[in-house]
Each structure stands twice: as C-alpha cells, then as structure tokens.
A protein has these predicted regions:
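Domain-level signal for soluble alpha/beta catalytic cores
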Residues: 1-275
Length: 277
C-alpha cells in the first residue's frame, strides 16, 4: 500500500493544537483516501522553527503556558493524536488527553485592551496619510541638514562587545544599579559619537548599545507581549533570539527610544564644545 503523510500539527507556530479540530481533519483525510493508503500523521514541517521545550519556562505563569506547545510538546501532541485517532469517535471524548486539551479552548484568553479597541474603531481614512508629504519632508530635511549628495554614515547598530554583554547581564542580575548601567551605556554612546566625528562621517548614529536583540528590546517596552526565559529560535547561522510572544492587544506603555535619542545629540554637543575650547 501507499503512505500519505499528513502535517496536522503546525510546526511553525508555538500554540497548542486543538484536538477536536485536528481529529475531525484526520477523519476527513482518512475518508477521502482509498483503502490501500495508510495515513501517517506528522508535523507540517521540521521543528527547527520553534523553541525546544516548555519544561524550563518556570517564570511563565501556568495560565499562559497551557496555551503553548514547543517542539517536545508537539511530539507529545502527535503521539496523543495518534492514539485518539485510532479510537471510535464515541470513546474519544472520555479520554483524559482529549478532556485536558479541550479545557484550554473552553475559556477565552484574557488579552484585550479597551483603549486599543476604541482607538482602532475610531481610525479614519486621513490617519493613514503622513503629513507633510514625503516630497515636502525631503526639501525641509535638505535645507536643515545641509548634507552632501552622498552622505557617509554607518549601520545604526555597533558591535555588542563581550564587555557590554557582561554589563547588561550584571544589571539584569541586580549586581549593579540602574544608574550604574545607564552611565556605562552613556559612556559607550559618547565614545561611539566621538569616533564617528573623528573619522569625518556626515550622519552620526548612537550605536544602539542600550539594547540586546532589537525585537526583544522593543517588545519589553510594549504591553500585550509575553517573554520567555529559554525559548531560543534560530535567526540565521549560529545567531539565536528569544522573540517576545504576541499575546494580546499591543500598545506602548512608555517612551521607547526618547531618552537615548535625546542623549546622543547632547553628547555630540558636549564633544564639539570641548573641541572649540
């Protein structure tokens, strides 16, 4: 006979599988196949796209964790679905694995924010148009900045050295104060600005020393996200990241970049004032 592999467990997302829906899908697939075709259930793709396991996420509340399924958990889901799919339909609903799974989907997730809902409901067509227009902004920027036709600059993010990573780790472990950490980052920014000025770049950047992974850093300044401890996934090559999980309505609870954006020009002004003296 022939084998048909059915990718019934999503290998790319991190969410728990709904057994009721998946068992209905498996039943439909089997009914559509000839008798000489054996259906083998599988994940929809390799599990390299998802974190390894939920076992070590001890800082994530169980009320959140029950909704997730990483690589190991997806394999457990496959095993349980395989057993349930072989049982008669009237027997499935009495199985503990099925009962426990369906409990998760019976309650609505608490993930909504009334203010976000209201703002979305009141969006108007003109809100999608940025003013002034791009052509006007270009003219204003050219007049104000006085840059050459092809200005020299760098990519915004400078290397995160082992010293910077060590300082950030010490701050997260409460081994140094927020003030000590802030002053350290300010010095890195000031040195970065000074170096760019010395080599004659036209457009300076502040180096982005204040952040770790960009997505994680910005996510921490927003509501509506959850954060994991060990849920690493591959970004590219040997680089791995822990992306925040979009849990509910996302909104900005505080300024994200204002403090550093304000400090960088100040450090440049101090540098130029010192050179003038």
């Amino acid at each position: 006979g022939k084998l048909l592999f059915a990718g019934v467990v999503n290998g790319k997302n991190i969410w728990k599988n709904n057994y009721k829906k998946t068992l209905d899908l498996i039943s439909s697939i089997k009914n559509a196949c000839d008798n000489n075709i054996n259906v083998v259930i599988s994940t929809s793709c390799s599990l390299l796209h998802v974190p390894y396991t939920l076992k070590h996420e001890d800082k994530l509340a169980d009320s959140y964790k029950i909704h997730f399924s990483f690589a190991e958990e997806k394999l457990t889901e496959l095993a349980e679905l395989g057993v349930l799919a072989d049982k008669k339909q009237d027997k499935v609903k009495s199985e503990n694995a099925y009962i426990d799974n369906q409990k998760v989907f019976e309650e609505e997730r608490n993930c909504h924010n009334a203010e976000v809902k209201e703002r979305l409901a009141n969006i108007k067509e003109e809100d999608y148009v940025r003013l002034p227009l791009r052509s006007e902004r270009q003219k204003l920027q050219k007049e104000k900045l006085g840059l050459p036709e092809f200005p020299t600059t760098t990519i915004g993010s400078f290397p995160q050295t082992k010293e910077i990573k060590a300082e950030r780790a010490a701050y997260r472990k409460n081994e140094i104060s927020e003030e000590e950490y802030t002053q350290y980052i300010k010095k890195q920014i000031a040195d970065c600005v000074k170096w760019q000025e010395e080599i004659g770049l036209d457009v300076l950047v502040h180096g982005e020393y204040e952040r770790n992974d960009m997505v994680e850093y910005f996510g921490e300044a927003l509501e509506g996200y959850l954060f994991t401890q060990k849920a690493w996934v591959q970004s590219y090559g040997t680089r791995c990241v822990k992306p925040p999980v979009i849990w509910g309505d996302v909104y900005r609870k505080k300024p994200m970049t204002v403090d550093w954006s304000v400090y960088a020009p100040v450090s440049y002004t101090h540098l130029r004032a010192h050179e003038t003296c």
